[in-house]
Amino acid sequence: GFDCVVVERWVEHLLEVRPAAITVHGRTLQQMYRGAADWTAIAEAARVARDTETLILGNGDLNTLVDAVRRAADSRVQGVLVGRGTLGAPWFFREKEQARRAFVEQVDLSTLPATMWEPPVSLRHRMQVMLDHARQYEAIAGLECFRSIRKHLGWYCKAFPHAAAMRGKMFGVSNVEDVERIVAEFCQDLILEEAAGS
């Protein structure tokens, strides 16, 4: 609903037209992307649609493949959609076949490899992927559209020291050279910091 949860009534109404699938975002329209996704409401949608041919897909707060498998299993949806968890993390789906198998076979999550909990991506690899992304974007879209990639470059800048400062700089880039300069400066500063700390 707009500002309250109306899952049962709404899903029953949607099921009248027998859709192939219904995606439940797990937040009200008023919440948008704020607050935690309501997976209890998503599970309620799955319960309401259980004896139908309509697939229920859940969405919200899926930051690792293990989150996706756990939420799908707990809520009894037939699948999940991942959005913001993949931004700045194109390696998110690296273990997707293992995750799919874990969901289908209802595997004990504690037996899954650590790489599914948090993919091991070095800071160097993150920077390289970001640079590759910027280079490919500029080659395809050209300089006149380069501003459009700023927010995507910003998503790579999370969960490491000084990420916020680097993210702020990414919102001002105009071309690949700007990105390369910022990454080079960041790496140089990091090397100097590490040397001073040892």
Task: Name each model-derived stretch.
Residues 1-3, 28-35:
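Short, small-residue-enriched loops and turns at beta-alpha junctions
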Residues 4-21, 33, 40, 44-58, ...:
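Alpha/beta catalytic cores of nucleotide-metabolism and tRNA/nucleoside-modifying enzymes
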Residues 23-27:
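Short beta-strands and strand-loop turn motifs
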